[in-house]
Design a protein with these regions (language model features):
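Sec/Tat signal peptide C-region and signal peptidase I cleavage site
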Residues: 22-26
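N-terminal export leaders
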Residues: 3-11
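Short, well-structured alpha-helical segments in soluble
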Residues: 74, 79-99, 155-156
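Extracytoplasmic ligand/sensor domains, especially the bilobed periplasmic-binding protein
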Residues: 97-156
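Bacterial N-terminal signal peptides
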Residues: 11-21
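Signal peptide-proximal N-terminal region
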Residues: 27, 51-73
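Extracytoplasmic "Venus flytrap"
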Residues: 33-52, 76-83, 105-108
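Short beta-strand elements in bilobed, periplasmic/extracellular small-molecule ligand-binding domains
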Residues: 66-79, 135-139
Length: 156
């Protein structure tokens, strides 16, 4: 289920974000940023997420990519260091020129990179539940907020 959701999200993200922002002379690839900790305390949780996104990218590319363009993953390691998420997010958007970012496993990592996304008009797919009461046009919150979880409990 998680893999299928990631696959659908990647495809939607490329269609929405990447193609309209690409320069006319762009290569036949769309760069996808992966912002998950591969070292430090959060690596045990986030390495699996990185692997899931890479697997989804491989599946999309095997089917011809997105609108004929292959997806090119750009993986960075913020090393479970919350301020480093902002720095690595900036690197992905400005130096690596990714069209979209998948990443962050904690609210503090998301909140660290959020000002960078807002400043540079980047797009983040955030893969986990969050506390709610935060809205950004630069973040797809794919996890449930508390009010959504409460509705399920009440209807059960």
């Amino acid at each position: 289920m998680q893999r299928r959701s990631t696959l659908k999200a990647l495809t939607a993200a490329m269609a929405l974000a990447g193609l309209s922002a690409l320069p006319a002379h762009a290569a036949d690839t769309i760069k996808v940023g992966i912002l998950h900790s591969l070292s430090g305390t959060m690596a045990i949780s986030e390495t699996v997420l990185k692997d899931t996104v890479l697997m989804a990218i491989d599946e999309i590319n095997a089917k011809g990519g997105v609108l004929g363009k292959k997806l090119e993953p750009v993986v960075v390691d913020p090393a479970s260091n919350w301020p480093l998420f902002a720095e690595k997010g900036r690197q992905l958007l400005t130096q690596d020129k990714v069209a979209v970012v998948f990443g962050c496993w904690t609210s503090v990592s998301r909140k660290s990179v959020l000002p960078v996304l807002d400043e540079l008009n980047g797009l983040l797919f955030y893969p986990v539940q969050y506390e709610g009461e935060e809205m950004s046009p630069n973040v797809f919150y794919t996890g449930a907020a508390p009010n959504q979880l409460g509705a399920v409990v009440i209807s059960a």
